[in-house]
Amino acid sequence: MANVTLFKQDGSQNGNVELNDSIWAIEPNENVVFDAIIMQRASLRQGTHAVKNRSAVRGGGRKPWRQKGTGRARQGSIRSPQWRGGGVVFGPTPRSYSYKLPRKVRRLAIKSVLSQKVIDNDLIVVDSFSFDAPKTKEFAEVLNKLDVNTKVLVVLEDGNDFTALSARNLPNVTVVPADGINVLDVVGNQKLILTQAALSKIEEVLA
């Protein structure tokens, strides 16, 4: 099994922690990661775009002139697409862009990006965080002690505690609970910080 250093909140080392090789030591599959990112970005699209077709534009119920005898081209409505102010043909309508990859593919994608963090030495495991109240400044000091000065994803066992409240207002810091870890957030941040409890929870789900 692979080992990584276990840190305390003050930045000091507290031994090593073993990682499950089936999650943290696989060969990263870039194609699957790409597919997972596209899927996740698609699900973030609002899909509220809309235009009015000829049935939705107000007016146009009366034939503008009689069918024959005027010498002009026949017309049935002033809201036909060829008219100024007419409806739009084949325009966008509200829709959902979300779709799902197979469960095994999604799991392979998250395992691939987690393994890549180990390969790049961008994984940091902390035994636990302890804050008596939401203190953004104190969490910033913790990051300095851990020598983290870039975009970082912090994964906690539970996102509803003082640690999450302390970290969420810092620029370049993203906080998610262990059951909310995802490919897009892992790829979008250079460093990955896990608590020991979050690590256990991730391995329990993905193993």
Curated annotation (Swiss-Prot):
Keyword check for Ribosomal protein: yes
Pfam families: Ribosomal_L4
Subunit structure: Part of the 50S ribosomal subunit.
Stored HAMAP family: Ribosomal_uL4_B (MF_01328_B)
InterPro entries per UniProt: Ribosomal_uL4, Ribosomal_uL4-like, Ribosomal_uL4_dom_sf
Ranges annotated as spanning the membrane: none
Recorded name of the encoding gene: rplD
Similarity-based family: Belongs to the universal ribosomal protein uL4 family.
SUPFAM superfamilies: Ribosomal protein L4
Amino acid composition bias (Basic residues), ranges on this chain: 60-71
GO BP annotations listed: translation
Organism field: Latilactobacillus sakei subsp. sakei (strain 23K)
Domain of life from the UniProt record: Bacteria
Described function: One of the primary rRNA binding proteins, this protein initially binds near the 5'-end of the 23S rRNA. It is important during the early stages of 50S assembly. It makes multiple contacts with different domains of the 23S rRNA in the assembled 50S subunit and ribosome.
Any one Gene Ontology cellular component term annotated for this protein: ribonucleoprotein complex
Keywords: Ribonucleoprotein, Ribosomal protein, RNA-binding, rRNA-binding
Name of the protein: Large ribosomal subunit protein uL4
Annotated GO MF terms: rRNA binding; structural constituent of ribosome
Region (Disordered): 49-78
NAD found in the keyword field: no
